[in-house]
């Protein structure tokens, strides 16, 4: 089982404060473990433009039609000071890894320098931090029914409003997660 380019969708009973009601996009999954980015946990009061300001990056030439007020996600509990940019191709940046035909992850500054310009990738999600599972750990969590899995959907990844991503991702599995046991007050 390879879950690269899949969503992990937290089951209602999962109460860990970071992963509760989360959707994790799996960037890498192999015999050594897995790595992913939470795509629906916005950091409070931090948008892309704030990251650019902190790094002293000024988009040149600025395209005012491109919004930089999108929320930055808490990508996971590890390396929360490190940026991960999920985006659609191209992958011409210094530190890019192609996850699928339509998804790339980049960790280098050069992708940030394109944000707000005509050079930026068409779809972008910026996160600080990532989630990781050791060998066999994710598989055990799946056996313990902590997660649902579904092939990733780019509309959910990049376009669905953040507050709706958990429910919409579960619909890929064919269920309304709000009606499942463990979701108090929503049945």
Swiss-Prot record:
<dbReference type="GO" id="GO:0005829">
    <property type="term" value="C:cytosol"/>
</dbReference>
<comment type="similarity">
    <text>Belongs to the UPF0301 (AlgH) family.</text>
</comment>
<dbReference type="Pfam" id="PF02622">
    <property type="entry name" value="DUF179"/>
</dbReference>
<dbReference type="InterPro" id="IPR003774">
    <property type="entry name" value="AlgH-like"/>
</dbReference>
<protein>
    <recommendedName>
        <fullName>UPF0301 protein YqgE</fullName>
    </recommendedName>
</protein>
């Amino acid at each position: 089982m390879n879950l690269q380019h899949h969503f992990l969708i937290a089951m209602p009973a999962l109460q860990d404060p970071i992963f509760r009601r989360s959707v994790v996009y799996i960037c890498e999954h192999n015999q050594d473990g897995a790595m992913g980015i939470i795509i629906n946990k916005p950091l409070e009061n931090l948008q892309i433009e704030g990251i650019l300001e902190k790094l002293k990056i000024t988009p040149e030439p600025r395209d005012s039609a491109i919004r930089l007020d999108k929320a930055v996600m808490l990508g996971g509990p590890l390396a929360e000071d490190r940026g991960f940019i999920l985006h659609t191709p191209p992958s011409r940046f210094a530190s890019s890894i192609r996850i699928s035909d339509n998804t790339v992850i980049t960790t280098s500054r050069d992708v940030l320098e394109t944000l707000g310009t005509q050079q930026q990738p068409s779809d972008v999600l910026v996160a600080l931090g990532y989630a990781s599972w050791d060998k066999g750990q994710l598989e055990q969590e799946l056996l313990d029914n902590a997660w649902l899995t579904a092939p990733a959907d780019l509309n959910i990844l990049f376009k669905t409003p953040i507050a709706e991503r958990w429910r919409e991702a579960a619909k890929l599995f064919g269920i309304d997660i709000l009606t499942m046991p463990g979701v108090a007050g929503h049945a």
